[in-house]
């Protein structure tokens, strides 16, 4: 199936487990996390933007389009996803969280293959042990259903995905590539590593 695809880096959360710090702007080897994400995405998709509800001018200074959630307050990643779908010109949007800088170069390829093969509107990552719904490829056509879902008070990503026929895609061969930097302790640990060869997918 021929489809147009854009990508969005999800950086709109409150980062409670990081003491409220803006995750995407935390430095890893001297570079903001979101720039690691952007670099890995750029080899897979041409049109990339960032969903951020804070520090938008800082993100925008990197030359990447930035947008906040249309819904007021912090409603979780689905709120940013809804706004992304509402503003998208592409048929599908690839979503990636801002705290996972090691994801594989074949992320889009495998998710798109699953969407094509199964004829579904959503495909997301499973690393063999855990589901990673914020790594997903989602059809713009779901924006109406997602708006209704959020208006009902629901916030659970996997529930929405399952209700809409999502398929999980096996990335167990690259499980370590979905390691996320969730806390300040995680950030300290990774900043102490000389390189990330043990995490970045081959």
Predicted features along the sequence, with ranges:
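Cytosolic-facing loops and C-terminal tails of multi-pass membrane proteins
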Residues: 202
